[in-house]
């Protein structure tokens, strides 16, 4: 396995690399990331994993500086999975100008759901993913469904900007108690970690009500928020939306997703659950 730090070197490698499946990450890899790598391996001759903590997608007061950087441990895990290349550029390599002059802005989604609480986040995501697609030139790219809004943004920019890459969504990896795997779970105290699976349980309760025919979307959302709040969560949102586009759900929609974001102590957790109605 090669660890490549420059765009020039990666492009030289890419010329003779056959088909490439790509998994972009910010490092600090866990089993959820490795599931993406395993899916990528099924789909191309070579797998490239990028590791880059992207300042542009962190808001003021977020955890950019304390976000764990664990390149050597990550590289060891990826080598064991048979990855061909780890692309680990530094900030100057990916953003040579102090200020990025041109950005990719996803207007329809950047101010909704997580975007409402993290201004500029999805502009940062869309910009860095566009840059990485141009550098890596993958045939396939794998993204986890845990970051559902991010996945929707990336699907949209891939279609609208004509990137020649197949986007492969991969199911959310979960701990045995249902908690979605996330690098931020390590910030939870022992008591918070015990409480954290409640977020997924609330999503399942909403899904169950929808499956039983409830059309009171606002009422279901409100009950989930109240339940989480009672147990000490600070809830950003619980919302029922249309799958893929994330448009507001309407009565009669058959493919739905319920999404949630909430803070437990100082840690912000997100999760979602897709629902197909008969």
Curated annotation (Swiss-Prot):
Miscellaneous comment as given in the Swiss-Prot or TrEMBL entry: The reaction proceeds by a bi uni uni bi ping pong mechanism.
Binding-site positions, ATP: 26-33, 144-147, 173, 181-184
UniProt record similarity statement: Belongs to the pantothenate synthetase family.
Gene Ontology terms describing biological process: pantothenate biosynthetic process
Chain positions recorded as beta-alanine binding sites: 57
MF terms in GO: ATP binding; pantoate-beta-alanine ligase activity
Protein name: Pantothenate synthetase
Entry binding sites for (R)-pantoate: 57, 150
Organism phylogeny: Bacteria, Pseudomonadati, Pseudomonadota, Betaproteobacteria, Neisseriales
């Amino acid at each position: 396995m090669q660890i490549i730090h420059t765009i020039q070197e990666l492009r030289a490698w890419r010329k003779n690399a056959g088909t490439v499946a790509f998994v972009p990450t910010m490092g600090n890899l866990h089993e959820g990331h490795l599931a993406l790598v395993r899916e990528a391996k099924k789909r191309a001759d070579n797998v490239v994993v990028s590791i880059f903590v992207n300042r542009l997608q962190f808001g003021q007061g977020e955890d950019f500086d304390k976000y764990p950087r664990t390149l050597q441990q990550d590289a060891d895990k990826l080598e064991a999975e048979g990855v061909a290349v780890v692309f680990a550029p530094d900030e100057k390599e990916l953003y040579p100008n102090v200020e990025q002059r041109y950005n990719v802005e996803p207007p329809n989604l950047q101010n909704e759901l997580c975007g409402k609480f993290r201004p500029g986040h999805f502009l940062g995501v869309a910009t860095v993913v566009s840059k990485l697609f141009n550098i890596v030139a993958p045939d396939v790219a794998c993204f986890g469904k845990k970051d559902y809004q991010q996945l929707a943004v990336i699907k949209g920019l891939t279609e609208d900007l004509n990137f020649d890459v197949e986007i492969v969504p991969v199911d959310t990896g979960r701990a045995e108690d249902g908690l979605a795997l996330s690098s931020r779970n390590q910030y939870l105290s022992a008591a918070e970690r015990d409480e954290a699976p409640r977020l997924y349980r609330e999503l399942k309760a909403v899904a169950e009500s929808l499956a039983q025919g409830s059309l009171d979307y606002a009422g279901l959302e409100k009950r989930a928020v109240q339940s989480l709040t009672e147990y000490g969560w600070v809830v950003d949102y619980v919302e029922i939306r249309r799958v893929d586009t994330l448009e507001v759900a309407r009565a009669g929609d058959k493919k739905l997703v319920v999404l949630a974001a909430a803070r437990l102590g100082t840690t912000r957790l997100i999760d979602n659950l897709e629902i197909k109605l008969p």
